[in-house]
Amino acid sequence: MNKIRKGDEVIVITGKDKGKRGVVLSVGEGKVIVEGINLVKKHVKPNPMKGTTGGVEAKTMPLQISNVALVDANGKASRVGIKVEGDKKIRFLKTTGAELSA
């Protein structure tokens, strides 16, 4: 069970974007893509087949999953725990104890 999932609000805890918040767009093997964070400029060639004009585009690059943490109700970074109730696993915030939606 992943502790960070698509749609979660996270805060960056290390790196050049430290302190910035965003929503997780996708989760991969040890990496997450967060909306509007870790932007890089990529040079793109014009391609009439794809409809691109070319030039310099800003692209969101993946971050290590260890460099982000979920945001609690107080706006602070929180670790995530997993507890088992019956046969279901439930994620919860370690700082407040609040349960997260599936």
From Swiss-Prot:
Gene3D superfamilies: 2.30.30.30. InterPro entries: KOW, Rib_uL2_dom2, Ribosomal_uL24, Ribosomal_uL24_CS, Ribosomal_uL24_KOW, Translation_prot_SH3-like_sf. Disulfide bonds: none annotated. GO terms for biological process: translation. SUPFAM superfamilies: Translation proteins SH3-like domain. One of its GO terms (cellular component) is ribonucleoprotein complex. It comes from the Bacteria. One of its GO terms (molecular function) is structural constituent of ribosome. Keywords: Ribonucleoprotein, Ribosomal protein, RNA-binding, rRNA-binding. CDD domains: KOW_RPL26. NCBIfam families: rplX_bact (TIGR01079). HAMAP family: Ribosomal_uL24_B. One of two assembly initiator proteins, it binds directly to the 5'-end of the 23S rRNA, where it nucleates assembly of the 50S subunit. One of the proteins that surrounds the polypeptide exit tunnel on the outside of the subunit. Belongs to the universal ribosomal protein uL24 family. PANTHER family: MITOCHONDRIAL RIBOSOMAL PROTEIN L24. Part of the 50S ribosomal subunit. This is Large ribosomal subunit protein uL24. It comes from Paraburkholderia xenovorans (strain LB400).
